[in-house]
From Swiss-Prot:
SUPFAM superfamilies: S-adenosyl-L-methionine-dependent methyltransferases (SSF53335)
Gene: ubiG
Protein name: Ubiquinone biosynthesis O-methyltransferase
Protein task: O-methyltransferase that catalyzes the 2 O-methylation steps in the ubiquinone biosynthetic pathway.
Reactions it catalyzes: a 3-demethylubiquinol + S-adenosyl-L-methionine = a ubiquinol + S-adenosyl-L-homocysteine + H(+); a 3-(all-trans-polyprenyl)benzene-1,2-diol + S-adenosyl-L-methionine = a 2-methoxy-6-(all-trans-polyprenyl)phenol + S-adenosyl-L-homocysteine + H(+)
The enzyme's E.C. designation: 2.1.1.222, 2.1.1.64
NCBIfam families (UniProt xref): UbiG
Binding site for S-adenosyl-L-methionine: R44, G64, D85, M129
One Pfam family, short name: Methyltransf_23
GO molecular function: 2-polyprenyl-6-hydroxyphenol methylase activity; 3-demethylubiquinol 3-O-methyltransferase activity; polyprenyldihydroxybenzoate methyltransferase activity
Keywords: Methyltransferase, S-adenosyl-L-methionine, Transferase, Ubiquinone biosynthesis
PANTHER family: METHYLTRANSFERASE (PTHR43464), UBIQUINONE BIOSYNTHESIS O-METHYLTRANSFERASE, MITOCHONDRIAL (PTHR43464:SF19)
Transmembrane segments: none
Native species: Escherichia coli O9:H4 (strain HS)
């Protein structure tokens, strides 16, 4: 395990990095700011593992890994996992938690574009969860993910749709009313319509395989996957 610093790349929003650096120490607090990520992680992991035909023995890259919630869970499934993030503090938290948990994950501080320049075609599975809406050029991230995966490999994206409902649910509801995440976490202007994401995918070697919505029920306080991509959604693609 290591957390290495690397040169600054153009596709970095330093204000976004600073937001997550400020709360990095609470990444593994199950009742803290990242509680929603802990709550949805079993759904994300299950979707990825099922669609990829299992993770055991596979080489996996988690782009925008943060404090390592998904990366660790994929390593527990028997994958060899590398986690990428540009936040130094979240990576330190991820590294320490993996050490305490006895989980082997290789954490690297560099952009996905930098990683793709050195490791093209080396991964069986690439995941990019809740990251695209936090960078200046999300299409560049999609291109890099396509470059990193092996032929026949799987790439997974998740993000937020851009519309009135997603603003009400993710910003007004989650940030201001329910206070599920810190205020300022989301910028609706950076949300991505499924048609936009699919358009970027179509310009790479990736092919869409499946898309699903991630839904929150405030009455039952539960999450589930299902039809409807009007707020949160996940996309499974495969390298041709």
């Amino acid at each position: 395990m290591n957390a290495e610093k690397s040169p600054v790349n153009h596709n970095v929003d330093h204000e976004e990095i600073a937001k997550f650096e400020a709360v990095a120490s609470r990444w593994w607090d199950l009742e803290g700011e990242f509680k929603p990520l802990h709550r949805i992680n079993p759904l994300r992991l299950g979707y990825i593992a099922e669609r990829a035909g299992g993770l055991f023995g596979k080489k996996v890259l988690d782009v925008g890994c943060g404090g390592g919630i998904l990366a660790e869970s994929m390593a527990r499934e028997g994958a060899t996992v590398t986690g990428l993030d540009m936040g130094f503090e979240p990576l330190q938290v991820a590294k320490l938690h993996a050490l305490e948990s006895g989980i082997q994950v290789d954490y690297v501080q560099e952009t996905v574009e930098e990683h793709a320049a050195k490791h093209a075609g080396q991964y069986d599975v690439v995941t990019c969860m809740e990251m695209l809406e936090h960078v200046p050029d999300p299409q560049s991230v999609v291109r890099a993910c396509a470059q990193l995966v092996k032929p026949g490999g799987d790439v997974f994206f998740s993000t937020l749709n851009r519309n009135g409902k997603s603003w009400l649910m993710a910003v007004v509801g989650a940030e201001h009313i329910l206070r599920m995440v810190p205020k300022g976490t989301h910028d609706v202007k950076k949300f991505i319509k499924p048609a936009e994401l699919l358009g970027w995918v179509d310009q790479t070697s990736l092919k869409e395989r499946h898309i699903t919505g991630l839904h929150y029920n405030p009455i039952t306080n539960t999450f589930k996957l299902g039809p409807g991509v009007d707020v949160n959604y996940m996309l499974h693609t495969q390298n041709k």
